Amino acid sequence: MGRFIFVSFGLLVVFLSLSGTEAGVCCPLGWSGYDQNCYKAFEELMNWADAEKFCTQQHKGSHLVSLHNIAEADFVVKKIVSVLKDGVIWMGLNDVWNECNWGWTDGAQLDYKAWNVESNCFIFKTAENHWSRTDCSGTHSFVCKSPA
């Protein structure tokens, strides 16, 4: 009987330690893991600069979300953004200095594009799986992304 309780307790500990993570990605409590990164949606409405600053304060290496392929975008839509009401989030892609030098706030290479041409910051319209340039002073919900 004692052995059974010990094994059951051990399995419970393993289960609880893995809950909220994907395929062994170790993320902070309340964050979801995908492909060696952690993600968390925030309902607060902020302008782009405030949202980016907020993300950098949440976890070491955290920034507004960067998307590098359709699979990652689908993960964000299905697992993360489902908690948000309007389906429009800030993302880390920007050209705040108006130099036509687009880049992700986390320093990652711009290797996947899906946008219209307009302003200097980007929102992700999750219902359409589409990016749109918009004015950086508007307010939107956002997703933070951090290395696991």
UniProtKB/Swiss-Prot annotation:
Note, other: Shows greater sequence similarity to the beta than alpha subunits compared to other heterodimer snaclecs.
Cellular component per GO, a single term: extracellular region
Function, as annotated: Interferes with one step of hemostasis (modulation of platelet aggregation, or coagulation cascade, for example).
Annotated S-S bridges: C27-C38, C55-C144, C121-C136
Family: Belongs to the snaclec family.
C-type lectin domain location: 34-145
Oligomeric form and interacting partners: Heterodimer; disulfide-linked.
Compartment(s) where it occurs, according to its Swiss-Prot or TrEMBL record: Secreted
Tissues where this protein is expressed: Expressed by the venom gland.
UniProt name for this protein: Snaclec 8
Pfam families in the cross-refs: Lectin_C
Source organism of this protein record: Bitis arietans (African puff adder)
PANTHER family xref list: MANNOSE, PHOSPHOLIPASE, LECTIN RECEPTOR RELATED
GO MF annotations in UniProt: toxin activity
Chief localization: secreted
Signal peptide region: 1-23
UniProt entry keywords in alphabetical sequence: Disulfide bond, Hemostasis impairing toxin, Secreted, Signal, Toxin
